[in-house]
Amino acid sequence: MFRQFYNMGKNPFSKGLSCADAFKTDDLAQVHARLDHLSRVGGIGLLTADPGTGKTFAARTWADRLNPNTTKLVYMCMSTLTNNDFYRQLARGFGIQMAYKKCDLFRDIQECVRSLACERRMRVVVVIDEAHMLHTSVLRDLQMLTNFEMDSKDYLSVVLVGHSVLAQQLSRQPYESLRQRLVVTYRMQGLGEAAARDYVRSMLARSGADPDLFDDAALAAAHGSCGGSIRRLNSIVTNALTIGAQQKSMHIDAEMVRSATEELSLF
């Protein structure tokens, strides 16, 4: 309804935003820089954020930049797995015929990675999303999975993407060995008020709408209610646009944003 009223070609605040339309935040630049380094040197990287801050989207926009001719990427998002199921899913990602025993799966995966890195000269990257849900046994195995040639080669890059609690978990003594293998770490900060304002106006302009549709007070109210979460901000803005269209208003004010927030029960 609001798309037609505000002359939008699309809803720029929808979940299905393409990587090409990504708004360039400082968080996004920091994530890309760190993961670029990790993919060059190998090892394990840790990307954490509070829910809704855009960590998965940041990882996706980075992965979208990779050249499939020079980089083999395996993305895993089913993290609530047993140890054996984890290896089976990983083997499937590499296109390996799955063995029955864990030790055989482990060997076959490492041989595949070694072949890709040494024979085809490819970078090999595994992105594990929702990694805060990984079983303890899987986390402990990751350090062995990245151990090649008696720990003298780094053929594999593993990116752990998860909630902030994952960093707290890895700070415990049982994970000391894994923590020492972390090559890069980054905790996303979320959108500040200025970035949130620029984001909303930029996305409105890209959709064909008036970038100043929301006044400054409305944008400040939207940011204050989203807590830095881009997912929450998208929901608030979308709901405010719906309210504005229903009221046939070409101007979104703070009161509309507050109504939108209350309807979403975000307070």
Language-model features: locations:
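Conserved AAA+ ATPase "sensor/coupling" helix adjacent to the nucleotide-binding pocket
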Residues: 92-94, 164-165, 173, 194-210
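Mid-core helix/loop region of P-loop NTP-binding domains shared across ATPases and GTPases
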Residues: 82-85, 98-141, 150-154, 191-196, ...
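Conserved NTP-binding/hydrolysis module of P-loop NTPases
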Residues: 8-15, 71-73, 81-100
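A short, basic N-terminal segment
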Residues: 1-41, 266
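Walker A/P-loop nucleotide-binding motif
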Residues: 41-61
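Conserved AAA+ ATPase "SRH/arginine-finger" region at the nucleotide-binding site
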Residues: 76-80, 170, 183-196
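Short regulatory helix/loop adjacent to the ATP-binding pocket of P-loop NTPases
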Residues: 63-66, 166-181
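C-terminal alpha-helical "lid" subdomain
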Residues: 198, 205-267
